[in-house]
Amino acid sequence: MTAREAAQAEPSPVGILQLGVAFWGSKTLLSAVELGLFTELAKGGPMPAEALGDRLGLHRRALRDFLDALVALGMLQRDRAGRYANTPEGDRYLDRTKPTYVGGILEMANQRLYPFWGRLTEALRTGQPQNEIRDGDPDFFAKLYADPARLEGFLRAMTGVSRPTARVMASAFPWRDHRSLADIGCAQGGCLAEILIAHPHLAGIGYDLPPVRPVFEAHMREQGLADRARFTPGDFFADPMPQADVLVMGHILHDWDEAQKRKLLRKAHAALPPGGALVVYDAMIDDARRENVFGLLMSLNMLIETPGGFDYTGAECQAWMRDAGFREVRVEHLQGPYSMAVGLK
């Protein structure tokens, strides 16, 4: 073996170093979203670096490095003439003018989560949230729900995140066997809308806190579903859940500690008729806790954001659902890091 071959055979630190500075790439994407780069390219089409920089008000010093880094990260395309353009994914999901926009959640990550995650070490040592609560500010969500404009923006962002999973769920669950569903913690109603559009025989209920009503009802009108979906206000811990053949809980359970998770599952079971179903979907961690990186990191994000929330495995969710009285419980992968747990009453 030559010296070169011997050196190449040694373990390399490259992977460690790349992961250690992975925030470089994350922040590059988040800044691009903040600047509206993808929206500008969707509007103006492919353009050279200088023209794009002028439109975005960027200094020339690092302009090409910034754009070419996005090319290398797979977030932009560059043709032989040196013009930059959106990828198909960027055009669909990062253009603010499109209903498929998911950048709202990235905007929140940039403004809030990025600095909060700088306190992860403290969170790991104390077990305490590192968001606004840490600094003595009012709870983020209390302020959010008191500000109609900000609330609408947040709920639209959640729709962008949930829509792809909802479309898969619309075909993965036997909706033909049921006549009604209620989305618990419905936000704008994006998940509910996707299912109702795919299954015209269904009637839907959106269940969330009272300030959500105008945003939900506006979205149902936009989707042509105002006659098939109604809003029921309520607090799912303090009030009874609405009655429907199917209850859906998406991105809900991971916000809470185990006792609260179990309470919500018991309340869902009590609200369902015999033969009714509960569908829970989240970024469920694989049972071996080795593969679903997003789910595991999301659980760390719950440490940053909540007093007791955590993400969970499919096996854990099934056990909680059985303890709450559900039968024929199963877990089914949907798409990406997301899976659903289904149980019958």
What do these predicted regions represent?
Residues 2-78, 175-345:
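Alpha-helical subdomain
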Residues 6-7, 13-43, 54-179:
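Conserved Class I S-adenosyl-L-methionine-dependent methyltransferase catalytic core
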